[in-house]
Design a protein with these regions (language model features):
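Surface-exposed extracellular loop regions of Gram-negative outer-membrane beta-barrel proteins
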Residues: 149-198, 311-375, 441, 514-515, ...
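Outer-membrane beta-barrel proteins
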Residues: 92-100, 132-149, 192-196, 265-267, ...
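Short, glycine/acidic-rich beta->alpha junctions
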Residues: 70, 177-184, 188-192, 251-255, ...
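Structural preference for beta-rich elements and adjacent junctions enriched in aromatics
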Residues: 1-319, 324-328
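Exposed, low-structure sequence patches enriched in small/polar residues
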Residues: 254, 364-667
Length: 667
């Protein structure tokens, strides 16, 4: 149990709104950081805003990044008083992993308060030295909790879903007949001990209820990254993290079952995962682009169908010295029915020779068996293998930061269970930056200047890109920021080398708790990848966040891109994302999402046939009631429409009704 009394000299300035869990980051909030293994490498974070809205995350001090996707089942409450606000937390020990011990526990602990006013302020019981790179090595130790009597650490989460989907072809054929499609599944999370956990799932519902944030993909040659949101993969996901992203579970699209074991014993951290996938999709990378492909099996009677594959993943990490690690990863995906397989083996290390310096290194080997469709579509040999090497040195102190990095990724390297969207290249980068910080009444609280040089060539030695960039980052009053970028590069594409120049300016501020506004402007001479020539791109991306009272939030973002070439405007693209949420309480909300994508092209300026105009419109209405992080009810409706040159208006092609209920039973 943890309680806070947060005094405030002006209670009217407290920023507190009702929101779904893990969305309180613009508010006042307070919480506790727990390094339960006392290894100064990984910690749990629990946060609560003044209205009791909760957030939780895992902080990885080795790789210096947090994971907000992790969710624990715990209770929180908060209230605003005449003196400030008060917060209480009840965190069950079964939600934490720690070393079993007959004697007292020793944990690293930090109590932190975020105090956003004219500037962002952080208050902690631990002074943090910016010249020391590690955070967890600087927090105090809490001793106690001797002779813990652990209860049965078991969660059984049954799932019930029903959907009713209508589709029709883009040629506007007849609608499919609607019908309810109920389904059931179950997740199990068993704490065998406090430091060893087994996750299992049977017939899981891995439907993604909430829409991904849209991304503009016009004049882009590489596959886009989307975050994982599914419960089975999120628990213990950080156990599989490495310097290079070799485990990207969004590639496991439609599993029928899954089994995962993760644990930590002393200096040893380990995890294994096995699953099947009813659909086999992965990234096929090249030096200048990538595509997502899905394997299919065809026969005369049923046509083409998705191919199942079996998946195995293993990870081991050994902690060394004060804050260093070495480890290994193995992944394997195979579909014997098609003669397909991809196996990856990796060794990695993160070394901290001083308090301010980090060396990260990872070597990977892959071997693939490629079925006929990969050989015909992508020119793959029957069997391929490749290597990958990544090395990076970073220095960060209170004033200076610099890095030197080198990548060497083989032409035939593939990580079909990871997110590796570029291969066949060698890359060198160096960056140096200087930061100034000011306290008191200075207009700018932080200024950073930096320069970056990088060079990329393919494995044959052909230069693909040479780039020089300069950065300016400033933070000022009203939580304002200004980020500027000026740079240029020599870029190779389709047999030609182009001189690119680019300028970018991002600005934003939050003058009151109810308003956040900003925009990014990017003006550049950049390659037109479709037609192999240089063009002028102007891109503007404004956004606004409005809060009406404590319950209603309005978020609108837009991206406008205009691309000109000799002869006129090649295309204009507009991408809008509107999300309006009424948060009844900290547990329930009603959200409306509207996403609109409009691309208009001058067909006479293209070398190949394109649509003159294409539009996509998706809408979703979603109600959610969350009892706990794992007990939740959804009900909603979504539809999708499109338009191309065949039609004069946007035409619907999908209508979906869905409902989902999950219940966390803890016997």
């Amino acid at each position: 149990y943890v309680a806070f009394i947060a005094s405030d000299p002006d209670v009217s300035q407290i920023r507190a709104f009702y929101s779904d869990r893990d969305l309180l980051w613009d508010d006042d909030f307070i919480g506790i950081v727990l390094d339960t293994f006392n290894d100064e490498r990984r910690a749990y974070e629990f946060w609560v805003n003044p209205l009791g809205v909760q957030a939780d995350s895992i902080y990885d001090d080795v790789n210096r990044r947090g994971d907000e996707s992790w969710n624990a089942i715990w209770d929180s409450a908060g209230r605003i008083t005449t003196e400030g606000y008060e917060v209480e937390m009840a965190i069950p020990l079964k939600q934490l992993r720690f070393s079993p011990s007959d004697s007292k526990q020793v944990w690293g602990v930090d109590f932190v308060r975020q105090f956003p006013r004219d500037r962002e302020n952080r208050i902690s019981n631990n002074p943090i030295d910016r010249d020391i790179l590690c955070y967890l090595c600087q927090i105090r130790k809490l001793e106690g909790l001797a002779d813990l009597q652990t209860s049965r650490n078991l969660e059984v989460i049954p799932m019930l879903t029903t959907t009713s989907v209508q589709n029709r072809s883009r040629s506007l054929g007849p609608w499919e007949k609607p019908g309810l499609d109920p389904d059931a599944g179950v997740d199990v999370r068993w704490g065998i001990t406090q430091d060893l956990y087994l996750n299992a799932t049977l017939n899981p519902d891995f439907s993604q209820v909430e829409a991904d944030a849209p991304q503009l993909d016009i004049n882009n040659t590489f596959s886009l990254f989307f975050p994982e949101r599914r419960t089975f993969f999120l628990d213990g996901a950080d156990y599989f993290d490495t310097f290079q992203n070799l485990v990207y579970t969004r590639n496991i699209a439609d599993p029928d079952y899954g089994l995962k074991l993760t644990g930590k014993s002393g200096r040893h951290t380990y995890g294994v995962l096995t699953a099947n996938d009813l659909s086999t999709s992965f990234i096929m990378p090249r030096s200048l682009g990538s595509n997502v492909t899905t394997l299919t099996l065809s026969n005369q009677d049923s046509g083409s169908r998705a191919v199942e594959s079996d998946i195995s993943i293993a990870r081991y990490r050994l902690d060394l010295f004060d804050n260093s690690t070495i480890g290994a990863v193995f992944t394997d995906r195979r579909a014997d029915a098609l003669g397909y397989s991809n196996s990856v083996a990796s060794i990695d290390a993160v070394l901290r020779p001083t308090n301010s310096d980090t060396v990260s290194i990872q070597g990977v080997y892959s071997r693939s068996e490629n079925p006929v469709q990969l050989r015909e579509r992508f020119g793959q040999a029957n069997e391929t293998s490749g290597n990958s090497l990544r090395v990076q040195y970073n220095h960060i102190d209170a004033e200076w930061d610099w890095r030197i990095g080198y990548d060497d990724i083989g032409k035939d390297f593939r990580a079909d269970l990871g997110f590796v969207n570029r291969v066949d290249y060698k890359y060198f980068v160096t960056t140096v930056g200087r930061t100034w910080r000011a306290d008191g009444d200075s207009f700018f609280s932080r200024i950073r200047l930096a320069a970056d040089y990088d060079r990329t060539e393919d494995q044959s030695g052909k230069e693909l890109e040479e780039e020089l960039e300069f950065f300016l980052n400033m933070n000022g009053p009203a939580q304002s920021y200004l980020n500027a970028l000026v740079g240029g590069s020599k870029t190779y594409w389709n047999g030609k080398t182009f001189d690119e120049q680019y300028n970018q300016l991002s600005m934003g501020f939050s003058p009151t708790a109810n308003l956040g506004i900003g925009a990014t402007l990017r003006i550049e001479d950049v390659v037109d990848f479709t037609n192999t020539r240089l063009g002028r791109s102007n891109r503007l991306g404004p956004f606004i966040r409005l809060q009406f009272g404590r319950h209603l939030q309005f978020n609108l973002s837009h991206t406008l891109q205009q691309f000109d070439v000799d002869g006129g405007r090649l295309f204009t693209a507009n991408l809008s994302d509107l999300r309006t949420t009424y948060q009844f309480t900290a547990k329930s909300f009603l959200r409306f999402t509207l996403q609109y994508n409009d691309r208009e092209r001058d067909q006479s300026l293209y070398l190949s046939s394109v649509q003159r105009r294409s539009k996509d419109l998706t809408a979703q209405l979603l109600y959610s009631y969350r009892f706990t992080a794992a007990t939740r009810f959804f009900i909603g409706y979504s539809d999708a429409s499109f338009q191309d040159d065949r039609f004069d208006s946007i035409e619907p092609i999908n209508r979906s009704f869905f409902a989902k209920f999950t219940y966390a039973w803890q016997p």
